[in-house]
Amino acid sequence: MSAANFQPLTPLRFLERSAAVFPDKLAIVCGDRRFTYREFADEATRIARALLASGIEPGDRVAYLCPNLAEMLIAHFAVPLAGGVLVAMNVRLSPAEVGYISRHSGAKLLIVAEELLSSVPDAGSLGDVGEMIVVADSEPEMDARSDGGLRVSSYENLRGRGSLEPLPWAVKDEQATISINYTSGTTGDPKGVLYSHRGAYLNALGEIIHSEHSPSSVYLWTLPMFHCNGWCTTWGVTAIGGTHVCLRAVRPEEIWRLMDAEGVTHLNGAPAVMTAIARAPEAHRFTRKVTVTTAGAAPSPTMIGELEALGARVIHVYGLTEVYGPYSVCEWQPDWHEVDPAERARKLARQGVGMVTAERMRIVDAEMNDVPADGETMGEIVMRGNDVMKGYYRDEDATALAFTGGWFHSGDLGVMHPDGYVELMDRAKDIVISGGENISTVEVEQALVSHPAVVDAAVIGVPDDRLGQMVVLCVVLKEGAEATAGDITGFLKARVSSYKVPKQVLFFADGEIPMTGSDTKVIDRDLLGLVQARLSTTGATP
């Protein structure tokens, strides 16, 4: 193998190519700002040079806490162009969680949007972070200042350290880490998932294929860029030469304004977001082809019907942070046009088959044997291939466990249908997916342990058309103790991120929450029935 027949794969090549092929084409829309592909590449180069001038060395982590701004998109190229590793953090994290990820990742630099400064803990909780860069709408030319021992500078100050001196849009090792994405775990501590340049490159191509992108694509960022690097669409839309339309916050009225003003053709997101869009007062039938790719929870027949009524094509994908976001797609079959809408929606709600760039999924029993493809026998969904993470950062034991038997174990339970399509039946990792966010039930339960009135608690996800799952907290109070639902949620708001606080709090008598014979695990199926019955009587059924 030589340079003549092998070059390491990297998403950096995507921007290099598009800047050469489409130099004057609109690449980014962000508020009043617009960037051509030439300007996109120039800005990535400038920021990469600025990072190098700021002391970033190969392999150093650069953390971002930003909404879907141009700066966040540019980071997906600038950070690896400088040889660094991007750590894009969930903008809804609490200060404690931001501190944990900063310390665990060993980030040297933190770039944060001005409106998220309240989510940043004190300097002593940030570990190796030596400087914080603040992205503000109005960028004053300010000198760097010190805040509790932490150097604080404006984004314009950072830009001023850069230049347009070219850097190679290449890497020596395609297995080098391009980003670390943190995901909730059953212990409540996030795990750092390592993405390689090769995996990101290939998954981005899969996104292009299965979301049906072309150079004419106008992609609206309804999906957070911090979610699996925007399902690798940060790189994919750039690769095909499409236009990125940034969305700072998910508000249906702003989404519809941008849809019409910019001629949006594609958007991704959780069913909760798509339902909000479809039901907005501004909603109207599309006058052009619009492709909606959804994941995070199975789309309900209601949601699919509402989007199709607007003229959208709905594509359902499935994956996890550990597989670069989407790994499978519910590939459309021609005969589905002939079935009634309810049956079509049921078929489309399945998780489907491996993407073109992925290997096939298997459903296995505890001995790693394939279960019958009968649509009834449950087993664990396992995956492998180029679209699987390198491993968990600084956690060899968890990595080894996840890769048992040479396959990545998703922890999700599913069935294999006779047509080879996988259907997810349950989440086996104690994770509730609500509004596209992963919420650790264990974390919420543990946060409540110290409440003086609580003796026991269980968190469960209840199916919900809008959120995918609604988080419900079941509480058992100590004998003689008193507490209201407001007391409980107020207690939790001080300890976990706001999106993890349950939407409903139900009180149960001691012994009423169904447990296994050993009293060590809640029987979720039985508890779900009790919860749904309770919600039904209170009129709070999703």
Say what each PLM segment does:
Residues 201-218, 226-266, 280-281:
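Conserved AMP-binding/adenylation subdomain of ANL enzymes
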Residues 93, 110-112, 267, 385, ...:
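AMP-binding/adenylate-forming catalytic core of the ANL superfamily
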Residues 497-521, 538-542:
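AMP-binding/adenylate-forming catalytic domain of the ANL superfamily
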